[in-house]
Amino acid sequence: MVKKVVSDLELKDKKVLVRADFNVPMKDGNITNDNRIVEALPTIKYIIEQGGKVILFSHLGKVKTEEDKANLSLQPVANRLSELLDKEVQFVAETRGEKLESAINALQPGDVLLFENTRFEDVDGKKESKNDAELGKYWASLGDVFVNDAFGTAHREHASNVGVATHLDTAAGFLMEKEIKFIGGVVENPERPFVAILGGAKVSDKIGVIENLLEVADKVLIGGGMAYTFLKAQGKEIGHSLLEEDKIDLAKDLMERGKDKLVLPIDAKVTKEFSNDGEIEAVAIDHIPADLQSLDIGPKTVELFGKELEGAKTVVWNGPMGVFEMSNFAKGTVGVCKAIAELKGATTIIGGGDSAAAAMDLGFADKFTHISTGGGASLEYLEGKELPGIKSISDK
């Protein structure tokens, strides 16, 4: 199914509604990482060049109370966007009403307007998050065409993506197009050998992803806290490392299904306390003492994973290999990140979330083919699910 892209739309003199993903991390009213804003620029600039009137909207955080509203305004995003575009971005501190409508009606071709956090509509009854039909229809009435560029919420059925799309000719923005191409391509038609690396704390978060990737990938390497549930299922002693007791049978079943594909750690970095300062040693995976816990994969596992990656043509990485926020337990994540970044001739994709943060912190971001902007959306896409935000984009 080929979806419409923004370049398929007639934009001149049109009011172009753009659902962006400006759900950026904030501290004390300041944006701490503007990557999602930067990723939206190609679509916005294209509409400006084509003589469209840009009407941007997005959610930011979870809004349940009036106090949340005070802390989660999109005003700082408008300011940052204005700097990045080097032009005025008009901010309207409302999600509906006369002030917003007259500001939109006064727009000239090439103008840019951002209105307030869509989740302000959740305070009195979750209208945005429950895809309230009236709200979707109202927002749609503000524009002539709709561009959905918010991959980060593509797995949600909200008024601001699916609701609006019900009423208008809808196209993917360039970021959404890129996500469909890379993440969708991995699931549907990867170049082989295809190696997936999964980390993070819990098996329960990634059951669907593991199941689907065992079908489509040639190898699935498992690190992070979730590896210990698999190791326990093999009968190994894991000390007091993270364990999901109720997922041991599932882990056995997955290992049975993926016996030639699943690769688990062979050594671990262990310590007594959940702290960066204790005594640390690297031990073989079947020698974790009862009073210790593993907080990272060991050097031999980094080497093993590096060997498994050799010659890969497609690599997807989702989730850190250890507690990478603590410097002494970041080496596994750093090692894997380096190994992927140094591959020649491979399509390398990071599936958002903590792995993306790790790659950026380490300065490897530009070494990857694609870093997804969607954590949950990437995971659900990798599960092989049809995402409502993508489904609702018009077909070509």
UniProtKB/Swiss-Prot annotation:
Pfam families linked: PGK (PF00162)
Annotated binding of substrate, by residue: D21, F22, N23, R36, H59, L60, G61, K62, R119, R156
Keywords, alphabetical: ATP-binding, Cytoplasm, Glycolysis, Kinase, Nucleotide-binding, Transferase
Family from the record: Belongs to the phosphoglycerate kinase family.
Binding annotation for ATP: K206, E325, G352, G353, D354, S355
Subunit organization: Monomer.
Pathway info: Carbohydrate degradation; glycolysis; pyruvate from D-glyceraldehyde 3-phosphate: step 2/5
Molecular function per GO: ADP binding; ATP binding; phosphoglycerate kinase activity
Cellular component, GO, one term: cytosol
Name of the featured protein: Phosphoglycerate kinase
InterPro entries named among the record's database cross-references: Phosphoglycerate_kinase, Phosphoglycerate_kinase_CS, Phosphoglycerate_kinase_N, Phosphoglycerate_kinase_sf
GO biological processes: gluconeogenesis; glycolytic process
Keyword Zinc applies: no
PROSITE patterns in the record: PGLYCERATE_KINASE (PS00111)
Localization, UniProt: Cytoplasm
Organism for this UniProt entry: Macrococcus caseolyticus (strain JCSC5402)
EC number(s) per entry: 2.7.2.3
Reactions it catalyzes: (2R)-3-phosphoglycerate + ATP = (2R)-3-phospho-glyceroyl phosphate + ADP
Top EC category: transferase
